[in-house]
Swiss-Prot record:
The gene is HOX9. It is found in: Nucleus. Pfam families: Homeodomain, MEKHLA, START. This is Homeobox-leucine zipper protein HOX9. Induction: Repressed by miR166 in the shoot apicam meristem (SAM) region of developing embryo. Residues 12-21 have a biased composition (Gly residues). Expressed in seedlings, roots, stems, leaf sheaths and blades and panicles. It comes from Oryza sativa subsp. japonica. Gene3D superfamilies: 3.30.530.20, Homeodomain-like (1.10.10.60). Probable transcription factor.
Length: 840
């Protein structure tokens, strides 16, 4: 009630609150505050909007000009002032929402108009096709074709400025027809819904040459600022290695024409990088809109002919660009179009989806650009506050440097100083060295003070049925499952000293404690920047039991449950605990890229516990179509780890790096098997391999045949049937393997210990044959026992050494082999049990 009275009394010209005078308390008359009184109250309000009773009493004592004001009136004035502030903020917020709704409504109306034009065009083409089918003799009538025709080869005019202006105008026309017209058949990208609080409108191409994506949305920045940001492509496009403007001249109409050479990183070690030679045209439209449009000047030739260009495949950019229109009351409507031909023919067939998917372009380029300018808009408005008092631009630079360092390691360009070293005969891990990555000046932030360089060990592998987001989250949250603390300590020590001692010279112990401290995240949590502290202790007598904590700067991409990204990453670099802005960074980590883009996200709540994730028939197991999608999901994993080295230790560090990455690959394979939706492949009703029985049936045959041939039970409760028996076999303490009963036996089934011993998954198991896991002596011993196996149905094999699928030696105490009989008593397959096995 007091606040309501204060609001009434606040209608005077004092601009603050109001109150009663002493004589008017009973009569109900109002009084006004003097300007001096209002000024004094405003000063206090600026310091403390809600003063306590004692603070108000102190105010009356300190300010004589308020002596005629009662404490109750002071309280009412502050209530009124807070209320007015709240109303003003709410009014401002509502005005901003109204402006946003108005702009969004305009955007949706334009989109609706474009769709109506597209429908009209499709109806016309449909009628024309019907007419053609009914009367094939009709001549070719081109009246229903698109008004936007394919331009001639731009090379015809590229030799002179006037010709370039003609190309620029053609590019502008084609770009606008894609951004706001019907030149491309756009379909909404799955998972993107328009609305006032949505990301924007995102669409991908359907049935056109190359791959294309379009996005439009509202951004609270001025058009000139947006254009400036978007033209600086390396600042927001993580795959952009460099962008160089070779020539720039005025277009004569207030615009500018630029000849641009751009290089892109390779997403994985299995494919070459791309580059572009383009014309970029910037101009202002009659309605005040700013346009930046771009297209390739040639598909393969043109541009700089440097030695570095030999590592690239020339890709083509079809008319693309940005249309930025100012909104009334501030802000802009942004249209972004990316249309590329990435020359998919030059990559292995299994990886071509990366270059043939418009959705990948939408996620990596188009929406990335829109997200970036929205992020900067929020930072500019003060909506984003980051930890440790860091400026947003500084943290954003750290993210860019981490990503760039990781991309440099994966691509390994010669002009950056990278050269491939000789291998050890097994080409599973690539070793490259870089002697240039040494700090010579104080400005080389990504270099180290070492008299040698940097060794990079990298590998790529295909994953089957492994959700990328779940894998990256597991690697982030369970570092001890794959990392070696000594190697982290080795890299971290290079930050503080000019020498690189090999791990083992200063033994360390990891306490197992990992503390993650968030620093920053993007608007939709697509990227998260954080500091990780690993707690460790030195174990040498000289150092005693000293604290040896290691700090890592870590960038996580796509780990959010709802993430629909095309790239999932975990990249980290050791950093000094003082965390200086110019800290040198040497990036290492993981990148998972889906090859089969799904329309839905990974099921939420997937457990990350290795033990529980191996429960057969677990309730966390997704069912139905989602499960089948996860089971069929393919992705490519790229691992790259970098280590500083001194020149005299180059070979030793290279060997160490190769072994370390191989151990990481093995760990990732083990983790992948555990978190895969089809992890055991042992769900009821699921076939292990085409033409083979269901898993519970095979488990029953294995146990029955073992008892039949050897006279003892393999499992204690072998009378159980179905999934209960299957689970006991899966959890059995020794490795059990089954191989086909053919001329060249291949493995068809293994329990958990069997998969661990072979360091493989059920999917990859079928690529291993029986003879590959034995050395020459082992194969000879096995072949000598084959007649006995065929005669009595089983045979004991002496202890020895076999090989895992990764080529590691595995010792076992004893092995037994027996024939597995089916329902018709015919030999279905051979089973092996390796007792007390371990890696050598």
């Amino acid at each position: 009630m007091a606040a309501a009275v204060a609001m009434r009394s606040g209608s005077g010209s004092d601009g603050g609150g109001g109150g009663y005078d002493k004589a008017g308390m009973d009569s109900g008359k109002y009084v006004r505050y003097t300007p001096e009184q209002v000024e004094a109250l405003e000063r206090v309000y600026a310091e403390c909007p809600k003063p306590s009773s004692s603070r108000r009493q102190q105010l009356l004592r300190d300010c004589p000009i308020l002596a005629n004001i009662e404490p109750k009136q002071i309280k009412v004035w502050f209530q009124n002032r807070r209320c007015r502030d709240k109303q003003r903020k709410e009014a401002s917020r509502l005005q901003a929402v109204n402006r946003k709704l108005t702009a969004m409504n305009k955007l949706l109306m334009e989109e609706n108009e474009r769709l109506q034009k597209q429908v009209s065009q499709l109806v016309h083409e449909n009628a024309y096709m019907k007419q053609q089918l009914q009367n094939p003799s009709l001549g070719n009538d081109t009246s229903c074709e698109s008004n936007v025709t394919t331009p001639q080869n731009p090379l015809r005019d590229a030799s002179n400025p006037s010709g370039l202006l003609t190309i620029a105008e053609e590019t502008l026309t084609e770009f606008l027809s894609k951004a706001t017209g019907t030149a491309v058949d756009w379909v909404p990208m799955p998972g993107m819904k328009p609305g006032p609080d949505s990301f924007g409108i995102v669409a991908v191409s359907h049935g056109c040459r190359g791959v294309a994506a379009r996005a439009c949305g509202l951004v609270n920045l001025e058009p000139t600022k947006i254009v400036e940001i978007l033209k600086d492509r390396p600042s927001w496009f993580r795959d952009c290695r460099s962008l160089e403007v070779f020539t720039m001249f005025p277009a004569g109409n207030g615009g500018t024409i630029e000849l641009v050479y751009m290089q892109m990183y390779a997403p994985t070690t299995l494919v070459p990088a791309r580059d572009f030679w383009t014309l970029r045209y910037t101009t202002t439209m009659e309605d005040g809109s700013l346009v930046v449009c771009e297209r390739s000047l040639s598909g393969s030739g043109g541009g700089p002919s440097t030695a570095s260009a030999q590592q690239f495949v020339r890709a083509e950019m079809l008319p693309s660009g940005y249309l930025v229109r100012p909104c009334e009351g501030g802000g802009s409507i942004v249209h972004i179009v990316d249309h590329l031909d990435l020359e998919a023919w030059s990559v292995p067939e299994v990886l071509r989806p990366l270059y043939e998917s418009s959705r990948v372009v939408a996620q990596k380029m188009t929406t990335a650009a829109l997200r970036h300018i929205r992020q900067i808009a929020q930072e500019t408005s003060g909506e984003v506050v980051y930890a440790l008092g860091r400026q947003p631009a500084v943290l954003r630079t750290f993210s860019q440097r981490l990503s760039r360092g990781f991309n440099d390691a994966i691509s390994g360009f010669n002009d950056d100083g990278w050269s491939v070293m000789g291998g050890d005969g097994i080409e599973d891990v690539i070793i490259a060295c870089n002697a240039k990555k040494v700090r010579n000046t104080s400005t080389s932030a990504n270099a180290f003070v070492t008299p040698g360089g940097v060794i990079c060990a990298k590998a790529s592998m295909l994953l089957q049925s492994v959700p990328p987001a779940v894998l990256v989250r597991f690697l982030r949250e369970h570092r001890s499952e794959w990392a070696d603390y000594n190697f982290d300590a080795y890299s971290a020590s290079s930050l503080k000293t000019s020498s690189c001692s090999l791990p083992g010279l200063r033994p360390m112990r990891f306490s197992g404690s990992q503390i993650i401290m968030p620093l920053a995240h993007t608007v939709e949590n697509e990227e998260i920047l954080e500091v990780v502290r690993l707690e460790g202790q030195a174990l040498t007598h000289d150092d005693g039991l000293m604290s040896r904590d290691i700090h890592l700067l870590q960038l996580c991409t796509g780990i959010d449950e709802k993430s629909m990204g095309s790239c999932f990453q975990l990249v980290s670099a050791p950093i000094d605990e003082l965390f200086p802005d110019d800290a040198p960074l040497i990036s290492s980590g993981f990148r998972v890229i889906p090859l089969d883009m799904k329309t839905d996200g990974t099921p939420a709540g997937r457990t990350l516990d290795l033990a529980s994730s191996l429960e057969v028939g677990s309730t966390a197991q997704p069912t139905g179509d989602a499960s089948m999608d996860d089971c069929n999901l393919r992705s490519v994993l790229t691992i790259a780890f970098q280590f500083p080295y001194e020149m005299h230790l180059q070979d030793s560090v290279a060997t160490m790096a190769r072994q370390y990455v191989r151990s990481i690959v093995s760990s990732v394979q083990r983790v992948s098997m555990a978190i895969s939706p089809s992890r055991s492949g042992l769900n009821a009703g699921q076939k292990i391999i085409s033409g083979f029985p269901e898993a519970p049936t095979l488990a029953r045959w294995i146990c029955q045949s073992y008892q039949f041939h050897l006279g003892v039970e393999l499992l204690r409760q072998a009378d159980d049937a179905g999934e209960a028996l299957l689970k006991m076999l899966w959890d059995y303490e020794d490795a059990i393997l089954c191989c086909s009963f053919k001329e060249k036996p291949v493995f068809t089934f293994a329990n958990e210990m069997g998969l661990n011993m072979l360091e493989t998954s059920l999917v990859a198991l079928q690529d291993l044959s029986l003879d590959k896991i034995f050395d020459e002596a082992g194969r000879k011993a096995l072949y000598n026992e084959i007649p006995k196996l065929m005669e009595q149905g089983y045979v004991y094999l002496p202890g020895g050494v076999c090989l895992s699928g990764m080529g590691r030696h595995v010792s076992f105490e004893q092995a037994v082999a027996w024939k597995v009989l089916g329902e018709d008593n015919n030999v279905h397959c051979l089973a092996f049990c390796f007792v007390n096995w371990s890696f050598v």
